[in-house]
Amino acid sequence: MTTSTRETRIVADPDVPLVRITREFDAPPSKVFRAHTDPELLVQWLGPRGLQMRIDSFDCRPGGSYRYVHSDANGEYAFRGCFHDVRPDELIVQTFTFEGWPEGVALEKLVLEDLGNGRTRLTATSLVDSFEGRDAFLASGMETGVVEGYERLDEVLAR
């Protein structure tokens, strides 16, 4: 299946507590990878418009960890995790936890596919520990955050 450049597809698997996100970008894998691994770029696009973001720690290497906080007038929303595998321009495997629900840990895998002509297909999967956790994740506004975040990433990649 091929998605259009601006379409973000978010699919919940009916058989396992997994969410799959697919998006294409008008940039080569090296540039998309850097935007995911350089904290100075990441802070410019991750999450929905209207939230401020700060990165408390970010060590993108196998065994490294991260913590970042989104904030708005209603409060702060902190996230953290550990990197398990990082392959430049190809793959990132990490855990992901929303600190407001620390028992809900997801295993995330981000794969970058070179489509040629300076384009990349990103496929991200998040395997959550339960259907309840996955459904709460989806109901949390995650779709808005992902779609708006990738729109913001388009802007960063165009620079």
Per-range role (PLM):
Residues L18, V93-V147:
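Beta-strand/loop substructures that line and gate deep hydrophobic ligand-binding cavities in soluble
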Residues R20-I21, E40-E76:
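Short beta-edge strand/loop motif at the mouth of beta-sheet-based domains
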Residues L18-T22, P29, M53, S65, ...:
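Intrinsic-disorder/low-complexity, polar/charged segments enriched in Ser/Thr/Lys/Arg/Asp/Glu/Gln
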Residues T22-R23, I55-F58, F79-D85, F96, ...:
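Hydrophobic/aromatic beta-strand elements that line small-molecule binding cavities or substrate pockets
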Residues M1-Q52:
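Hydrophobic ligand-binding cavity/cleft-lining segments
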